[in-house]
């Protein structure tokens, strides 16, 4: 029997995708070989590669103004590639909403970029999304869409005339997005859209001009990968294959509007369970900024019970509920692949646990 996996990433995958990958692992489409064994230059793999890119654009409703790049190095490499490629001679503005924006700021500073933190919620242990106004003449404005550790999420992105950069790693492909002022939108795919080893970057083509004539190593230059259709070097072929299956699955769900509707229902059920616990459970994030993806909470009346909660949950068939080491507590990551019945199972366990130990 499969466990209910609430891990923050790598995370649970739809069973249909795992079963299809299992079926095709040794014999892809009856061809007598695995997709992992063939050259990335073959037509067979190119169909997967380019098909995945087109499906990703279709899900977000993007036209040819955007390039889709498949890169390695995780989202963390983007912390350096973004300022390397997109910083000009002005100020790069960041909103600091958690660990991942702090890391991005640090990488830009290492590169000698003129970085300004224009908003931060660090003084309240990142329990909310701070109000932010970016200057129109900044080189770019940078935000993290969803904060995996602290359980906060932008309900709407800031409106700005300067190019907006969005790290969407932990709410990738979970809802429709207004791209009207987004210049670069990226994430590692291992939370909501595949397995580890692949990053997907949507970059507006006019931004690629900034990479021209810069002294950047070829592998770190967005233009290199755009001009070579993300095939400059050997890509992570199996991760791209799995990403392609995820794109098919999302389209079969009815697209991102339907996925968002389901995600909203799941989150509402879990937050209601916390809010109606008479203070036994307490969420970390302010209600207005609660994440639909990561629900971080404590056993407020006795935090010593939290390891027992995790242990008993595992015995009941639920894994990945231990909070991040920085924040502690309990965290349920309720990504796309989890269904409403699985959230209901968690809520029933939470009520039973409260009944035993309140």
Swiss-Prot record:
Entry binding sites for L-glutamate: 41
One GO molecular-function entry: pyridoxal phosphate binding
Cofactor: pyridoxal 5'-phosphate
Domain of life: Bacteria
Entry-linked Gene3D superfamilies: Aspartate Aminotransferase, domain 1, Type I PLP-dependent aspartate aminotransferase-like (Major domain)
Record's GO cellular component terms: cytoplasm
Pfam families (UniProt xref): Aminotran_5
Catalytic activity: O-phospho-L-serine + 2-oxoglutarate = 3-phosphooxypyruvate + L-glutamate; 4-(phosphooxy)-L-threonine + 2-oxoglutarate = (R)-3-hydroxy-2-oxo-4-phosphooxybutanoate + L-glutamate
Enzyme class: transferase
Pathway listed: Amino-acid biosynthesis; L-serine biosynthesis; L-serine from 3-phospho-D-glycerate: step 2/3; Cofactor biosynthesis; pyridoxine 5'-phosphate biosynthesis; pyridoxine 5'-phosphate from D-erythrose 4-phosphate: step 3/5
Keywords noted in UniProt: Amino-acid biosynthesis, Aminotransferase, Cytoplasm, Pyridoxal phosphate, Pyridoxine biosynthesis, Serine biosynthesis, Transferase
GO biological process assignments: L-serine biosynthetic process; pyridoxine biosynthetic process
S-S bridge residues: none
Enzyme Commission numbers on file: 2.6.1.52
Subcellular location: Cytoplasm
Annotated pyridoxal 5'-phosphate binding sites: 75-76, 100, 148, 167, 190, 233-234
Modified residues (N6-(pyridoxal phosphate)lysine): 191
Chief location bin: cytoplasm
InterPro entries the UniProt entry points to: Aminotrans_V_dom, Pser_aminoTfrase, PyrdxlP-dep_Trfase, PyrdxlP-dep_Trfase_major, PyrdxlP-dep_Trfase_small
Cofactor binding note from Swiss-Prot or TrEMBL: Binds 1 pyridoxal phosphate per subunit.
Functional description taken from the UniProt entry: Catalyzes the reversible conversion of 3-phosphohydroxypyruvate to phosphoserine and of 3-hydroxy-2-oxo-4-phosphonooxybutanoate to phosphohydroxythreonine.
Family indicated by similarity: Belongs to the class-V pyridoxal-phosphate-dependent aminotransferase family. SerC subfamily.
Subunit organization: Homodimer.
Name the record gives this protein: Phosphoserine aminotransferase
């Amino acid at each position: 029997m499969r466990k209910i996996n609430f891990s923050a990433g790598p995370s649970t995958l739809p069973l249909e995708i795992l079963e299809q990958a299992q079926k095709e692992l040794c014999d892809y489409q009856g061809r007598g070989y695995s997709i992992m064994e063939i050259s990335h230059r073959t037509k067979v793999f190119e169909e997967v590669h380019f098909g995945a890119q087109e499906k990703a654009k279709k899900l977000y409703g993007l036209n040819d103004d955007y390039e889709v790049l498949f890169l390695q190095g995780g989202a963390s490499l983007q912390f350096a590639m973004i300022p390397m490629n997109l910083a000009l001679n002005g100020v790069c503005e960041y909103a600091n909403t958690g660990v991942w924006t702090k890391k991005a700021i640090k990488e830009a500073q290492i590169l000698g970029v003129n970085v300004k933190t224009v908003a931060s919620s660090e003084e309240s242990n990142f329990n909310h999304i701070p109000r932010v106004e970016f200057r129109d003449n900044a080189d770019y404005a940078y935000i993290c869409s969803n904060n995996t550790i602290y359980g906060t999420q932008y309900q709407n992105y800031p409106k700005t005339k300067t190019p907006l950069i969005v790290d969407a790693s932990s709410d990738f492909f979970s809802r429709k997005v207004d791209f009207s002022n987004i210049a670069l939108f990226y994430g590692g795919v291992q939370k909501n859209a595949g397995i580890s080893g692949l990053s997907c970057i949507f970059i507006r083509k006019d931004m690629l001009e900034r990479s021209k004539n810069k002294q950047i190593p070829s592998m770190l230059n967005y233009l290199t990968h755009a001009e070579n259709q993300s095939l400059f070097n050997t890509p992570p072929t199996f991760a791209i294959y799995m990403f392609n299956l995820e794109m098919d699955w999302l389209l079969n769900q009815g697209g991102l509007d339907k996925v968002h509707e389901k995600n909203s229902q799941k989150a509402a059920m879990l937050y209601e369970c916390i809010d109606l616990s008479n203070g036994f459970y307490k969420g970390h994030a302010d209600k207005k900024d609660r994440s639909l993806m990561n629900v971080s909470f404590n056993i407020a009346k006795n935090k010593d019970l939290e390891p027992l909660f995790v242990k008993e949950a595992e015995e009941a068939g639920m894994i990945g509920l231990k909070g991040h080491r920085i924040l502690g507590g309990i965290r349920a990551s309720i990504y796309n692949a989890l269904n409403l019945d699985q959230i209901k199972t968690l809520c029933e366990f939470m009520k039973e646990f409260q009944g035993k130990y309140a």
